[in-house]
Amino acid sequence: MRISLSTARRLAIRAQGLDGQWRLPKGKEGVAQAVERLGYVQIDTIAVVRRAHHHTLWSRRHDYQPGMLHELQAKDRRVFEYWCPAASYLPMRDYRYYLPTMRGIANSPRTRAWLADHANLVDEVVKRIRREGPLTSADFAAPEGRKRGSWWDWKPAKQVLERLFSMGELMIAERRNFQRVYDLTERVLPPDADTKQPSEDERARFLVRRALSSKGIASAEQMGWGRMGDRAAAARALEQMVESGEVTPVEITGLDAGPHYAWTETLEAVSGRTRGRKHLHILSPFDSLVIDRRRLRTLFNFDCKLECYFPEAKRRYGYFCLPILWGDRFVGRLDPKADRKQKTLLVRKAMFEPDFTDYEPLLPALAEKLRAFAAFNECERVVVERTEPRKLRVPLTRALRAAPAPSRCAGQPTR
């Protein structure tokens, strides 16, 4: 089957809940369902605007509040933290499929050797957590008057915590001021958590289902099997799902990228549907839609560079650029900073793609979204310093003045 590039993009956008078709409940339950549908939400430390995990969820539900994610992890146990492959929030219902990864880490020769070399420290760390309850790495700092170098030394203790977490012996009970709080896995897992080790075939089918459900359309390479499972088993599972008719292989017109795969049911729905209203999104660079940079270039002809690690003189787009998605294409980038003391969202630069010129309908939509994003970042106004092209700064500023005030669901604290 052959599909257009536009259809492929719409499949990807729909799977990510960015085309207005998701029907999620309001509040925390809607956030939990968003995590389940996305499969994972990547965690990141950069905080020039709301951190990536909060930003990603806000992009799907504008009534999202950061406290909702905390409750889903710390109280409701609907999500947990683990590697996917970076640190991520994951649906608790998928916990069992990560057990083989944990077991593989625990049984690796490198881990066994490290544990043998640090056996006393491991024992002391586990005993403290069992006795005192959930602890952060900072709780293992050396007490006043005690020399560093003993088991109280923070760095070795932190390494133990991270090793035991990767092995599945400890879990993150919650985050306090973004610091991980570790506890025994048996005390974090909810009573109804499924802890049965999946068979190789079960896990392979899970990997294919998660990839297609979250990506909408993907090549075998883009499914990321090598990071988590056996490539051969996943390839067999994919082949079986194609044979059963669940999955359809497609070629994308205009792309020399080999076969891609999509759910047959979704493919039929999107292929037979005319384009609806364009939705505009300001996305995190760690958003699930853009995190695979190679796929982003292939499917959307868009480059999303993270330049915060570059010297300032070598940055083309800015410290922490946010892609602008409008309809089924990426039309530009923003380099923002939330000054919460001044309650101002500063857009240091708004840049648009060289081949994009349809500014008249875009600017009002962008202005409205910027005001909502500002509210989400606890800011009351938006200031645009520069634009590329330069001629757009005045009309964008004018559009911001005319944009409707964001509702409380745009990220304002609720009481």
Please identify what each model-predicted range represents:
Residues 1-415:
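Long, charged, low-complexity, helical-prone intrinsically disordered regions
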